């Protein structure tokens, strides 16, 4: 941790009577520690400064970070705005649901949400579409004997999303290339010159948006077809509000972004946990054999409680979204502090996911906390998907594909008489921001 903080910046100071975490570097602030060791940074700040403190996010400025459980309520607060997200990442998230509030957010969300509910996913045949793609990929892993897990789950998620969108197989390499260039917008310096990440990222975004507009035109020309994109376009066109195609295209692009990176990380962590805890693998195999096939409908998921518990516990212990930025529109009372209007806020989901105030034995990976529960799932139990008006619209889609993946993995590997084994260390190379993921080099064997 010490090497990730600036040893020359030790001065204790206040902003609006709230302490600023020492150790920020010029230009990049606390980003090295936020990216590489966020859990320890949050614990150190809480221990030395209390529950409210400022972190320096470099180009995004200072965000007032609160580890008091009251901060979770900010996600539902009417005087807290998500518009700060667009200001931090305008090139990627401008005009999307995650950066909108109030009436604009409701209009856009209402126009497409039906396609993402269990009934909509079932009618569109999404489970039937995904199952053979997932089976083929895990069979390839079995045949190879070992894989570098995060790149593999990333490629699988891209294949699922492109299949969802109807991208022809021969076009997949081009889409892969443009998508990788699009991701450069996350970290691109604001220098727009030929050959630099900002120029390449913008060009890739424009190319992808042009393809998505063609998908929208095709969906309208073949309105009788089923599928998630067709259903999104149909629901969008039936909306009572006059909404532009720019909004529709931006949110289909958001589906591509959100559906790939975060889900691939969760999928990789699921395999890692199965590899390092043989009892989890045995329980999953037993369930998969009882079910006998990869589920394809949401109604089938209740037959897979172990796979669902694996999905939920992985999200809790290894949340792919660790921090959420917000802006206070009015003066707020947050715990024992008054927060001025206009304050930029950081809600540390990672901290709450592993808080002893919210979870029993939070550092233990335990499926029993889900399998033995009798009460319904609470908002705090799925905080990785957000809550209130901004709860993730893809929640049911992620739930379906990760349970499908778990069952397919167990059936395929058990039939071959093999199980996942961890071939490398886990802690080195982890990243926590802008999204969290395990090391890109972790290898999993099947033997």
From Swiss-Prot:
Residue sites binding heme per the record: 392
Gene name linked to the record: cyp117A2
UniProt family annotation: Belongs to the cytochrome P450 family.
Cofactor(s) listed: heme
Protein function: Cytochromes P450 are a group of heme-thiolate monooxygenases. They oxidize a variety of structurally unrelated compounds, including steroids, fatty acids, and xenobiotics.
Name assigned to this protein: Cytochrome P450 BJ-4 homolog
GO molecular function, one term: heme binding
CDD domains: CYPBJ-4-like (cd20614)
UniProtKB keywords: Heme, Iron, Metal-binding, Monooxygenase, Oxidoreductase, Plasmid
Listed Pfam families: p450 (PF00067)
EC number: 1.14.14.-
Organism: Sinorhizobium fredii (strain NBRC 101917 / NGR234)
Database matches in PANTHER family: CYTOCHROME P450 26, LANOSTEROL 14-ALPHA DEMETHYLASE
GO terms under biological process: sterol metabolic process
